Amino acid sequence: MQPRKSARSNKGQHSQWSLQDVLRQEQDDDVNSEPRRKKSKVESDSDDVYDDAGEVANASSENDDDDDDDNNNDKNEEDGEVRCTPCGANKDNYDEETDEGGTMIECDKCHTWQHAKCMGYRNERSIPKKYMCNLCQESKSETKKKPEKEQTTPGYSFTLRDKTRISVAKAFFGVFHKNIPPASLPDGIDAVMMATKWAQELEAEVFKVFPSKDKHYTDKSRGLMVLIKKENVMRRISTGELSFYDLVNSSPEEIDEDLKVYAEKVRQESIRRSVLTVDEGSQRIRRTHKGEEIVEDANRQSEEADVNVVPRNIDHRRIKEDSPPREIITNSESQTYYHNEEDDDDDEQAEADGEESNKDDVNEDSSDSDDDELDMILKDKKDENKEEVEVRQQPAKPAPVPAKKPSFEKESAEVWKGEIVFPDFASFSAVAELKSCTNYVEPSDSQTARNFSRFIKVGKELLSRKKHEVEGRLDKNRADDYLNKVVSSRDFYLIEIKPTANHPDYDKLYGYLLDREKVGVLSGKPSFAKDSYLITLEKSRPLPPYLSTLKGFEQSTGLFALYVVRKGYVPAAPSILKNRSSYNVPAPIPPTNSNHHSKPMLPQPPAMAAKPKTPLLDSILSTLGGAQANPVPKPQPIPQQNHQFQQPHFQHQPSGAYNRVPSLPGKPNLPSKPTFGSNASNAPNYNKQHQTSDLNLSGDQMRYLQELVKNNPQQARHEPQALVGMAANSGASFGGSGLPAGDDDDEFPTYN
């Protein structure tokens, strides 16, 4: 009976296991068959090699007795010396049986043995086919580096490695070799050696300035090659007057005097070509890069225009056909001569001056439209025309009159008078003068005078109060750091504070801030000023950095107000209605001889001061009301319901009619102010049908109209209706009474 056999013959075995065993065996055979001079020391613990049967085999190839070549290799390997420098093993202390270093490998060059682990190889597969020990590798690297360091060129040698630097140095060498004066060569040194030395030194200086070797490096090298070719530059280099450092870091004009003279000639020629020239035909020619352009002569235009003007004040009886040519005289006797520069009409003269001032100020700041600056411009125009040039008759071609230089007057630098107070410490009267500011220019003509006037206006706005207090103190170093940071983004105004007399409190405050290194904080700065400080300056000490940028300032000892102002601030132009504060000045005067009424009266606004009406006021009231001015209306009792007033329309009324004054936009029409004690006999008689339409004018409205007429007499005399538009446009300035703003409709709020 045969033993039972399982249907699964490969039960418990992997189907591919035998194939993997074969592949592993072939790989091991290939590894063992590689010709390698290696010495494997087998240790029973760590370096055992197992064969396919699982038995331990010695790495010294004792099982390969049949191979004669392997025996010969083992014999040669035993002959090499052991020299493992990392662990210190050598032929004296090395014992193959007790060595724990593991596998040893032989150097293919010196045939010495080292531990594979000491040489950095973790296993046998990482060992290269051609192995060299650490000592042999160092000697090999040194021999390879030596030829790379030196790059010889016939005639001279350089130790540079970069191709760009070598090419630049060679170019310098060529220029030096050709241009070195033989007399400047020292004994024992020829031109080749000197040129080589100079070329290397010059290239090194260029490389220090431009280490990136970019376009600037090459451009600078080319420029230096042109310079060192010049005889005077080469002479200065050979004598030691010009060093290579100065040669690289100086401009060509500073090195070569001839080039400096040539550059100056080029600049002068450029300036000459840019200036307008006048040819013989009185044509102005502008020379530009596009060529010559003929510009129409403005003087010729003005002369032709003067010829065509028909004079209105010429005495035609003096003109004769055979009259002599005109002669230029000074206007001192007759007023019948033709006025060539001014017209006798005041209105036309003012209009012409206004047009000229507008043309002059097209490119100026908006502040040039201020009244004071306009007065200065008009004053300059009048100063130019003080000596009037007149002609007896009008020739065919008038002769040109030489123009006078415009004159100007420097405005006073004083911007303030008042009192400086340090609470509970010091108080003194002082004046303030503008010393300097950002973009400050000392007045030298009409333009700079206008700018100076603008600076003075800003200074007056900064110190607008009569009394300024020192609100606080700040450490000077901290303030200096802050001011140094904002000096480029803000405008600075430096104003000197001087006492009106020898005041001890001034010296007391100055000594306190100076000794303790403090900065005072001034009160009352306007909205356009960010900071206001009271600082101390001493002539013997250097200026702070933020003040060194201010021009026109000579350092002195004393107290100074420093304002940090918004960049480019320009003072606003004044309104056509000046002195607005005067509308609030009149104080109420209690009425006298009041009439007693049984009914309660309306609450009245403050009474107007007794002030006689002027004819101008009567004129405008007549225009506004449509009739003659009415005396102050009679008192009215309180009605049962709230009064609502309708805004009247402007229209012509028949003589004797008296209409209510139209209310201004944005202001209510208040009930009329009662006046007590007025005699009925003194009041004019009116028709009964017009008694109900008395003038309704409050005290504030009356004061406003009086100031309006006072400040604008021309409009009140000739165009009273224009004052209504002025009052409408400046409704915010209506007396400052704090009344509620009216609606845009015809109905106004009820006065309770």
UniProtKB/Swiss-Prot annotation:
One of its GO terms (molecular function) is RNA polymerase II transcription regulatory region sequence-specific DNA binding. GO terms for biological process: regulation of mRNA 3'-end processing; transcription antitermination; transcription elongation by RNA polymerase I; transcription elongation by RNA polymerase II. Residues 9-19, 329-338, 675-693 have a biased composition (Polar residues). Residues 290-303, 313-325, 376-391 have a biased composition (Basic and acidic residues). Residues 1-99, 289-408, 625-693, 710-752 are annotated as: Disordered. Pfam families: PHD_5 (PF20826), SPOC (PF07744), TFIIS_M (PF07500). A zinc finger (PHD-type) spans 81-139. This is Transcription factor BYE1. The lineage of its organism: Eukaryota, Fungi, Dikarya, Ascomycota, Saccharomycotina.
